[in-house]
């Protein structure tokens, strides 16, 4: 990916590359939705499935509608590579537990030993006036959009 970004920018310095995170939405707009963090948590709470996350896994998880809303201002960005999504608030165990808490469900989470850091720093975007909610804040926005704010 890094090589592809470098090659594109070498040929077209005005190109804009957006690095996207894991995204989610909830059912309700009659669009197909693949598995995502809140739906995986809701499913596991119903089925008793054990979910596995690591305290050494850092990544932002973004509400897709917030990503879409920020695409329009991104059209004005100068050439370059940008992290385009929510910054993480904690490791994935903390994030999964926060999501379960906000969704008001009990879910079994076992810790795995995966080590990965896909955390995004969106400071470069903020310098151009484009902002994202944090991972945990974005779920609050999502629940409000679907009028599920009573869960918070």
Locate the predicted segments by residue.
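Active-site helix adjacent to the Tyr-X3-Lys
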Residues: 2-6
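Short glycine/proline-enriched coil/turn segments at helix->beta-strand junctions
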Residues: 10-15, 47, 75-80, 101-105, ...
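NAD(P)-dependent short-chain dehydrogenase/reductase
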Residues: 7-58, 66
């Amino acid at each position: 990916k890094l090589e592809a970004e470098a090659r594109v920018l070498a040929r077209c310095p005005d190109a804009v590359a957006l690095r996207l995170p894991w995204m989610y939405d909830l059912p309700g707009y009659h669009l197909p939705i693949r598995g995502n963090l809140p739906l995986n948590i809701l499913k596991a709470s119903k089925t008793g499935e054990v979910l596995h996350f690591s305290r050494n896994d850092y990544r932002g998880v973004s509400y897709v509608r917030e990503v879409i809303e920020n695409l329009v201002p991104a059209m004005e960005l100068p050439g370059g590579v940008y992290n385009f999504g929510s910054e993480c608030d904690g490791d994935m165990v903390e994030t999964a537990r926060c999501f379960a808490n906000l969704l008001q469900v009990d879910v079994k989470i076992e810790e795995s030993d995966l080590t990965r850091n896909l955390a995004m720093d969106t400071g470069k975007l903020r310098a151009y006036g484009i902002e994202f909610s944090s991972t945990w804040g974005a779920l609050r926005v999502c629940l409000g959009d679907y009028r599920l704010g009573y869960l918070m």
